[in-house]
């Protein structure tokens, strides 16, 4: 969660969300775990870990916890519009009269979201505006509505790879929601020479890369920080001949074991900000999980400083593809 939102909430003379049992939706970090009687419904394993460390209840999963257990909800608006719509759908399960507070940065899209709240929520009232952030209040009314499931938001995306039609299933809040991204497509054109053996798709998203790795791997693990991504990958990989172990983790799982290759289109964004530490930590940890002569292969924007980082960690780094915007980097664990 941004410091601006936290500051806005902290400056309110009246903080009704601090009274009674509160569910914080999409917390974006652990800052609000200090609120009395607060629980979190999170979509990021790293953020969930902050709440666990603070000894607070946290649910890092697609489905909401039992909403009847809470006296109020604090909804932190996500930058992904469809994810917000899915989360709003789940609020239909709230008991009538339950207050809902919405907080978010203006650039996250909170204003248009407030203009189009579903009919089962009362028209929102603006409580505060500060530091380019907004705070609104609403509540569940008596209108009956059956919440849509996450499966109702699934999209089947098709694309062409090596003159073959391929597909994957994606869900709200997962990278590459509308189409395959060009960086991933470039990477997929350079995986057939990977060594046979146990492989990993790090930051697997909707399982696009893992699905293609199934043709070269004898055993496969795919991990992601998002439970929604794990659910999308599960659908995408359901009928593949090589069973993939899906892991929800912030980084490479500690007990992941050793691999013959690790492949990724690693993320470098946290919310709306660039965060290079995600990829730096991944590159460092990847070497520890590779067997001798194991292969490390990633795709990234050309402007990112990964060749130097990969070289410093592995002692070697080569470019095996470059389309002018993205490069595929290759290193061997020696």
From Swiss-Prot:
<comment type="function">
    <text>Specifically methylates the guanine in position 1207 of 16S rRNA in the 30S particle.</text>
</comment>
<dbReference type="InterPro" id="IPR029063">
    <property type="entry name" value="SAM-dependent_MTases_sf"/>
</dbReference>
<dbReference type="Pfam" id="PF05175">
    <property type="entry name" value="MTS"/>
</dbReference>
<dbReference type="GO" id="GO:0052914">
    <property type="term" value="F:16S rRNA (guanine(1207)-N(2))-methyltransferase activity"/>
</dbReference>
<keyword id="KW-0698">rRNA processing</keyword>
<dbReference type="InterPro" id="IPR046977">
    <property type="entry name" value="RsmC/RlmG"/>
</dbReference>
<keyword id="KW-0963">Cytoplasm</keyword>
<keyword id="KW-0489">Methyltransferase</keyword>
<protein>
    <recommendedName>
        <fullName>Ribosomal RNA small subunit methyltransferase C</fullName>
        <ecNumber>2.1.1.172</ecNumber>
    </recommendedName>
</protein>
<dbReference type="InterPro" id="IPR013675">
    <property type="entry name" value="Mtase_sm_N"/>
</dbReference>
<dbReference type="GO" id="GO:0003676">
    <property type="term" value="F:nucleic acid binding"/>
</dbReference>
<dbReference type="Pfam" id="PF08468">
    <property type="entry name" value="MTS_N"/>
</dbReference>
<dbReference type="InterPro" id="IPR023543">
    <property type="entry name" value="rRNA_ssu_MeTfrase_C"/>
</dbReference>
<dbReference type="InterPro" id="IPR002052">
    <property type="entry name" value="DNA_methylase_N6_adenine_CS"/>
</dbReference>
<comment type="similarity">
    <text>Belongs to the methyltransferase superfamily. RsmC family.</text>
</comment>
<keyword id="KW-0949">S-adenosyl-L-methionine</keyword>
<comment type="subunit">
    <text>Monomer.</text>
</comment>
<dbReference type="GO" id="GO:0005737">
    <property type="term" value="C:cytoplasm"/>
</dbReference>
<keyword id="KW-0808">Transferase</keyword>
<dbReference type="InterPro" id="IPR007848">
    <property type="entry name" value="Small_mtfrase_dom"/>
</dbReference>
